[in-house]
From Swiss-Prot:
A family per Pfam: PH_CAYP2
UniProt keyword list: Calcium, Metal-binding, Repeat
InterPro entries, per the entry: Ca-bind_SignalingProt, EF-hand-dom_pair, EF_Hand_1_Ca_BS, EF_hand_dom
Entry protein name: Calcyphosin-2
Coiled-coil ranges (or none): none
Species, as recorded: Macaca fascicularis
Alphabetical list of SMART domains matching this protein: EFh (SM00054)
Gene Ontology molecular function: calcium ion binding
Protein origin, superkingdom: Eukaryota
UniProt keyword NAD present: no
Residues binding Ca(2+): 193, 195, 197, 199, 204
Residues covered by the EF-hand domain: 144-179, 180-215, 216-251
Length: 313
């Protein structure tokens, strides 16, 4: 989980060993068109959560499921890319899992940390209550608000570490007319500021109060971006997007209400407004666009079709 597009699109595979509760993670690296090798990313060892309610507790089988976030101290892993080591924590999102293997390993004797499970459930309820309040405000304006919010946070982030304070977030919500009650905001802040240092990653803040698309949808966003990012730099020139975006099968083109060029120009204009650089789009900005679009589309397959059709994935 990173604002750096190259890091966000890294292809990783991990293994958890129940006999000693250790884990290891490898990265797929492609060299040329046909050669792929697997390199160590996180060395095999026993690790603990670095953030959240489970901070300090060792990873266990129950921590692994689609959508789970694994956290590691970047300083513990000397071989990590410099772009990742710039951040205190390395955060990895589980996007796929071998469910058959997982189910076969689960046993009725697995001890449950009931107090933490209850706390995490309550945390989710706090966020859901806020998300429900904001859902109506985001309806039909999701793309504009999410892309605008992402750009606004980048401008506030003078140090470039992704961390902002409480006043920054309150101001951002006010600017984009996403105000929530003081009680709800403080409840969310207590959960998000788990280190108690008065600063929170703005990506975590957005995911908490607005929510995020599921991993199935997100996998197609990554596929589209990776197809555009020919050189794997983490940013895509607007010229690449113009070249690859196909509006031929867009509903408004088929109905005759718009031309292909009008749809393409409208899409590019929306992206440009969201970008910090006028001639390229970062992965975070690309994801913000589709995060906003996702809010307005209920059915997963409808969303995937909207992605697959113009990008040919």
């Amino acid at each position: 989980m990173s604002r750096n597009g190259r890091d966000a699109c890294r292809e990783l595979i991990g293994f958890f060993f129940t006999h000693d509760q250790s884990l290891t993670i490898y990265e797929y690296r492609q060299f040329g068109k046909n050669r792929t090798i697997v390199l160590p990313f996180i060395q095999k060892s026993i690790y603990s959560h670095q953030c959240g309610r489970r901070k300090g507790k060792q990873y266990r089988l129950g921590d692994f499921y689609v959508g789970a976030t694994l956290t590691f101290l970047s300083s513990d892993h000397a071989s990590l890319p410099e772009s990742i080591k710039e951040n205190t924590f390395l955060k990895l999102r589980i996007t796929h899992i071998d469910q058959i293997a997982l189910d076969s390993l689960k046993t009725a004797s697995m001890d449950q940390e009931d107090d933490i499970v209850i706390q995490e459930t309550n945390d989710r309820l706090v966020f859901k209550a806020i998300q429900d309040v904001l859902k109506e405000k985001l309806h039909k304006r999701g793309v504009r608000i999410l892309t605008g919010l992402g750009k606004y946070f980048q401008q506030l982030d003078k140090e470039g570490n992704g961390l902002l304070d409480k006043a920054d977030f309150k101001q951002a919500l006010k600017v984009f007319h996403l105000e929530v009650s003081e009680k709800d905001f403080e409840s969310a802040w207590l959960i998000l500021d788990d280190n108690g240092n008065g600063k929170v990653d703005y990506g975590e803040f957005k995911r908490g109060i607005i929510g995020e698309m599921n991993e199935y949808r997100k996998s197609y966003v990554r596929k589209a971006f990776m197809k555009l990012d020919f050189n794997k730099t983490g940013s895509v020139p607007i010229t690449n997007i113009r070249k690859c975006y196909c509006a031929k099968k867009h509903s408004q083109v088929i109905s005759g209400h718009s031309t292909e060029e009008e749809i393409k120009s409208s899409f590019l204009e929306t992206l440009k407004v969201a970008c910090s650089k006028s001639d390229e789009v970062s992965y975070g900005e690309f994801e913000d666009y589709y995060e906003g679009l996702s809010i307005e589309i209920i059915d997963d397959e409808d969303f995937v079709t909207i992605l697959r059709t113009p990008w040919g994935i």
